Amino acid sequence: MMDINEIREYLPHRYPFLLVDRVTELDIENKNIRAYKNVSVNEPFFNGHFPQHPIMPGVLIIEAMAQAAGILAFKMLDSKPSDGTLYYFVGSDKLRFRQPVFPGDKLVLEATFLSSKRQIWKFECKATVDGKAVCSAEIICAERKL
C-alpha cells in the first residue's frame, strides 16, 4: 500500500530513526493502519542493547507504533510534513510489553484513531511478532504547525 519512498513523504524521520518499512493496510474510513518494521541485526541499537543477547529497546517499539499512528494522522488530514505540520509523541497510557523483539523479527504495527481534541490525537496501538502480542498502548500525539 505504501513503500518506503512514500512513507518518507509522510514521516520526517530518517535513518537511523525511521522505524516503519512498509504500510500494508490503510483504511481512512475506519481510521486504522497496519505497517511493519523488519528488525535487522544491523540496527545500530543492537551494539549496546545487549551485545550478547540483542533485543529491541522498548522505547523504540513505542516510537515505531507512534510513527505508524503519525502516518495515519497525516493521511486522515490529507497533509504531509512538507505542508508545515508535525506530530510529536507526547505520551502513552495503558502501556504494556508482552515479550521481547529480536533481530530477524518482523514487527507488525497497528494503530486505530480514537479521538482528537485541540490538536491532541489519541490512538490505540499494538505491535506483534508472528501474531503474538509484543506491546500495546494508547499513543498520544500533539499536532504542531512549523
Swiss-Prot record:
A GO term (biological process) for this protein? lipid A biosynthetic process
Q: Which terms are listed as keywords in the entry? A: Cytoplasm, Lipid A biosynthesis, Lipid biosynthesis, Lipid metabolism, Lyase
**Enzyme nomenclature, EC number:** 4.2.1.59
Q: Identify the InterPro entries for this entry.
A: FabA_FabZ, FabZ, HotDog_dom_sf
Highest taxon of source: Bacteria
Question: Per its database record, what is this protein's job?
Answer: Involved in unsaturated fatty acids biosynthesis. Catalyzes the dehydration of short chain beta-hydroxyacyl-ACPs and long chain saturated and unsaturated beta-hydroxyacyl-ACPs.
What the entry lists under HAMAP family is as follows: FabZ
User: How is this protein named in the record?
Assistant: 3-hydroxyacyl-[acyl-carrier-protein] dehydratase FabZ
Species of origin reads: Pseudomonas syringae pv. tomato (strain ATCC BAA-871 / DC3000)
Upper lineage is: Bacteria, Pseudomonadati, Pseudomonadota, Gammaproteobacteria, Pseudomonadales
Gene behind this protein: fabZ
